[in-house]
């Protein structure tokens, strides 16, 4: 098991079922050292208000030896790469994930989807693109992977895509992983947990990576320090409380 999980939702996204405390308890039980809460951006119908993200600044950094990153899974809004995260929200957040969600950006043709995703990557506002292998959104995988490598943005392999949602993602995700490998980019693994019980579960992701001989040194979840080094290289100030993770 990798000790870092970068994608999960709490009861603040009302189609999810666990609290921050639930995730901390599961992290201790499963040996997770660092995790990110990434509730849906406010343009989703059941997402928290933008004040929720601003007020994450009051969260403790470490509880019982487990580090907590303040994050968001923002929505890609248009072909210009705008996301529903702005202003003071950025000041409170450590990790910005962004992806396509049908209520905010309906599936378009391959060229339009690709344009929107690459514009988001190039914006400088995002660290990870969530579930880029979603079969509802055809993209130019090679072009996206090359843009992500250029701009130091990770592409996610999402465990939930193979179990609960986005059915038919396997072939696309293998293509994504191979393209990231060839471009020299990063992948991020996400459980996309909507209940704490699936936190840290990456078994299906690892099958995808194994199938393309993906280099472990380009997986962000291998250690807290690797992930933190990545975020710091993107401009995040070092977080003193995480020094011993």
Curated annotation (Swiss-Prot):
Entry superkingdom: Bacteria
Cellular component aspect of the GO annotation: cytosol
Binding-site positions, Zn(2+) 1: 7, 9, 73, 192
Residues annotated to bind Zn(2+) 3: 73, 101, 131
Pfam families: PHP
EC class (word): hydrolase
Keywords attached to this entry: Hydrolase, Metal-binding, Zinc
Disruption phenotype: Mutants show no swarming ability.
Presence of keyword Zinc: yes
CC cofactor note: Binds 3 Zn(2+) ions per subunit.
Residue positions binding Zn(2+) 2: 15, 40, 194
EC number(s) from the headed UniProt entry: 3.1.3.-
Transmembrane listed as a keyword: no
Cofactor requirements of the protein: Zn(2+)
GO molecular function: identical protein binding; phosphatase activity; phosphoric ester hydrolase activity; zinc ion binding
Record comment: activity regulation: Activity is stimulated by YcdY.
GO BP: bacterial-type flagellum-dependent swarming motility
Subunit structure: Homotrimer. Interacts with YcdY.
Function: Hydrolyzes p-nitrophenyl phosphate (pNPP) in vitro. Involved in the swarming motility process.
Similarity annotation: Belongs to the PHP family.
Protein name: Probable phosphatase YcdX
Organism listed in the record: Escherichia coli (strain K12)
Encoding gene, per UniProt annotation: ycdX
């Amino acid at each position: 098991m990798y000790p870092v999980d970068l994608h999960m939702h709490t009861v603040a996204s009302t189609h999810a079922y666990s609290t921050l405390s639930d995730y901390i308890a599961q992290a201790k039980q499963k040996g997770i050292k660092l995790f990110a809460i990434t509730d849906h951006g406010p343009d989703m119908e059941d997402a928290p208000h933008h004040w929720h993200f601003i007020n994450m600044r009051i969260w403790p950094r470490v509880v019982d030896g487990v580090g907590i990153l303040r994050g968001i899974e923002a929505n890609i809004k248009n072909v210009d790469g705008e996301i529903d995260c702005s202003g003071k929200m950025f000041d409170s957040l450590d990790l910005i994930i962004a992806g396509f969600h049908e209520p905010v950006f309906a599936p378009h043709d391959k060229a339009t989807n690709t344009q929107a995703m690459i514009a988001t990557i190039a914006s400088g506002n995002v660290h990870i693109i969530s579930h880029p292998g979603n079969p509802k959104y055809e993209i130019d995988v090679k072009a996206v992977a090359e843009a992500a490598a250029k701009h130091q943005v990770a592409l996610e392999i999402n465990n939930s895509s193979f179990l609960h949602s986005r059915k038919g993602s396997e072939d696309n995700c293998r293509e994504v992983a191979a393209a990231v490998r060839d471009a020299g980019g990063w992948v991020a693994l996400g459980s996309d947990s909507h209940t704490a019980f699936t936190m840290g579960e990456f078994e299906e992701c690892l099958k995808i990576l194994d199938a393309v001989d993906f280099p472990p040194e380009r997986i962000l979840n291998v250690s807290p320090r690797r992930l933190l080094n990545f975020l710091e290289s993107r401009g995040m100030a070092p977080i003193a409380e995480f020094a011993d993770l």
